[in-house]
Amino acid sequence: MPYIPMPYVVEQTHRGERSYDIYSRLLKDRIVFLGTPIDDDVANVVIAQLLFLESEDPDKDISLYINSPGGSVTSGLAIYDTMQYVKPQVSTICLGQAASMGAFLLAGGAAGKRFAVPNARIMIHQPMGGFQGQATDIDIQAREILRLKAKLNDILAKHTKQPLERIEKDTDRDYFMGAGEAKEYGLIDEVIVHKPKATEKKAQ
């Protein structure tokens, strides 16, 4: 993979200049960016940011921007569970694509606060896995992936309000949607051209 220089932002403070990498600067505005395949390392960083932002202000929304092809189911579920665990509502915004676990996280945002831009692409499907080893080990792994498949389908049905039978049918193969189709499906709430207005603190 070619090296991509990290952009830095310089700000003036009463103590002089201070520089931030672009992601740290976005974090100051309660923006978390998920722009890579999802693995344990990526999940740990996203989870740490969500927990930090909750400790900073438990009553102010967090924005999770997603441009991801998906990745590890367990890593994605760790992020999803943290989104539900933290007190701030987590708004999700899809730029580019949200596929596989990326789409799952997009759908798992706070109700009414799940967005995609007009040219975004969303794809859902069943979890994939390849196994080697003794027949009994392969059988154990196959049963586990079927358990995860059922769990993911149940959660998607809850967030989209689609019948479980439709979720099971649609995720049997890669199911691609544009932003408008994703709204009709219930994966997002709105297609947006401009950034949503900043969310104020919840009323006490």
UniProtKB/Swiss-Prot annotation:
Keyword presence, Hydrolase: yes
Keywords: Cytoplasm, Hydrolase, Protease, Serine protease
A single GO BP: protein quality control for misfolded or incompletely synthesized proteins
Compartments reported by the entry: Cytoplasm
Record's keyword annotation contains Cytoplasm: yes
Free-text function comment from the UniProt entry: Cleaves peptides in various proteins in a process that requires ATP hydrolysis. Has a chymotrypsin-like activity. Plays a major role in the degradation of misfolded proteins.
Name this polypeptide is given: ATP-dependent Clp protease proteolytic subunit
Source taxonomy: Bacteria, Pseudomonadati, Myxococcota, Myxococcia, Myxococcales
